[in-house]
Amino acid sequence: MYTPANNHNRSLAMSTQPTPAAARHCKVAIIGTGFSGLGMAIRLRQEGEDDFLIFEKDAGVGGTWRVNNYPGCACDVQSHVYSFSFEANPEWTRMFARQPEIRAYLEKCWEKYRLQEKTLLNTEIGKLAWDERQSLWHLHDAQGNHYTANAVVSGMGGLSTPAYPRLDGLENFQGKVFHSQQWDHDYDLKGKRVAVIGTGASAIQFVPEIQPLVAALDLYQRTPPWILPKPDRAISETERRRFRRFPLVQKLWRGGLYSLLEGRVLGFTFAPQVMKLVQRLAIRHIHKQIKDPELRRKVTPDYTIGCKRILMSHNYYPALAAANSTVITEGIRAVTANGIVDGNGREREVDAIIFGTGFTANDPIPRGVVFGRDGRDLLDSWSKGPEAYKGTTTAGFPNLFFLMGPNTGLGHNSMVYMIESQIAYVLDALKLMKRRELLSLEVKAPVQERYNEYLQRKLDRSVWSVGGCKSWYLHPVSGRNCTLWPGFTWRFRALTRQFDASAYHLTTTPLAALSNEARQQAEGVPA
């Protein structure tokens, strides 16, 4: 795999550059231990590269499937496609795996490939800065430790930082407050009056779990989601035995599920009229599970299905229809010491407030964390929303790769497929760096710009843009869709199958050591 240039005839080769004595060096630094980070580490090891470190801010691995452990937490993509292609699991017990089983799967992968020795737990990278003189990334953790790396792979994704709405008076509330991603399992909800704020993917899973326990459940809904029945079921021991004995059967099953899911993209991007048929199914689901006309009205969206993420549940609507549940659509005026005042001025007393308000997906990395060439903050480059070339690299940030980066999200299939596509692209880039003794590679700004213009043209015609809703897919400042891939996943895989060196500035000498004219040429700026 990737080895820094070490030719004795070239005094500027990276391996001859001194690094601070306190810094621990690796060729590849991987941030995060979800599907992205672990997948990258496993593939590096399979390719024979062992000089890498994995940084994980939490006390264990699993990423979002470790920290999101609220009641009812589960995947909304079938288990056999929501897993690594190179690490099939014949032991899935349900069609849609629940959080403990997915976390256990990732932990098993971590252990099988002996990644414990490469993982630094409880190590949050607080600053990441590019050093032009040495062509290295400097990483600093919260404890003050210093690391350097030739390349950095970010596997943090966009679902790592909880989003909280701004509510007047929240600081005065005397009861319990927490976000679904930071569930307080020590707090007993039994017999409590609970307010749930938000109706996203997390809320529709935990609301049915807590509704039978609480004395009263007030659900504050700004925009209702479209919800389809969830075709979940247990996978029998007979089926699991068949998958164990005949791996090809499981492979064919996985392929069939993938193809079935892949076809759904037609309604999102190519033929939005198809969504009318899906919308009828969703309306039928509402009428089947809710008898009260007023509640039906409250939970029926006024936008085209697919504009916001389509959710799946078989027990959310019955939970809302229960006698102890109230759906409040008037908004929130303020939070008081003992409750919440709605938009009509009515105060409802509660013992606890639970946020089901999602994540900061459009600004996944805060300001002051990542600094590229010339000390540029990543958020300055992303002022109109996250932007990358093939969702993986960003101009001005050499040797930095994003997995689950901008415009790689899906509304129809498994993200693991996209992650594996990106991993293959990054591996090919690292191989090129070794083969050609490169110190750095950086996507050309015009190439990145043209690629994203192409994406936005496709997205402008999609249901996500014309469906009549305001969703977290769209950046709050620019209105651009910085989240989703507007097409078939196999098309993205074709684009990332091979690293396209012509789209990049490739350097064998640190830019800081070049003459001004040579530096401008390397950066693609006319002299």
Swiss-Prot record:
Q: Which cofactor does it need?
A: FAD
Q: Where does FAD bind?
A: 36, 56, 64-67, 76, 82, 125, 415
Keyword set, alphabetical order: FAD, Flavoprotein, Monooxygenase, NADP, Oxidoreductase
Please explain the role this protein plays, according to its UniProt record. Answer: Catalyzes a Baeyer-Villiger oxidation reaction, i.e. the insertion of an oxygen atom into a carbon-carbon bond adjacent to a carbonyl, which converts ketones to esters or lactones using NADPH and/or NADH as an electron donor. Thus, can convert bicyclo[3.2.0]hept-2-en-6-one into the oxidative lactone products 2-oxabicyclo[3.3.0]oct-6-en-3-one and 3-oxabicyclo[3.3.0]oct-6-en-2-one. Is also able to catalyze the sulfoxidation of methyl phenyl sulfide (thioanisole).
**Cited InterPro entries:** FAD-bind_Monooxygenase_sf, FAD/NAD-bd_sf, Flavin_mOase-like
GO MF term set: flavin adenine dinucleotide binding; N,N-dimethylaniline monooxygenase activity; NADP binding; oxidoreductase activity, acting on paired donors, with incorporation or reduction of molecular oxygen, NAD(P)H as one donor, and incorporation of one atom of oxygen
Q: Which residues bind NADP(+)?
A: 74-76, 199-205, 222-223, 308-309
Residues flagged as site, Transition state stabilizer: 309
Per UniProt, what is one Pfam family of this protein?
FMO-like
Q: Family assignment?
A: Belongs to the FAD-binding monooxygenase family.
Query: Which lineage?
Result: Bacteria, Pseudomonadati, Pseudomonadota, Gammaproteobacteria, Pseudomonadales
This entry's Enzyme Commission designation comes to: 1.14.13.-
Q: What class of enzyme is it?
A: oxidoreductase
Q: What is this protein called?
A: Baeyer-Villiger monooxygenase
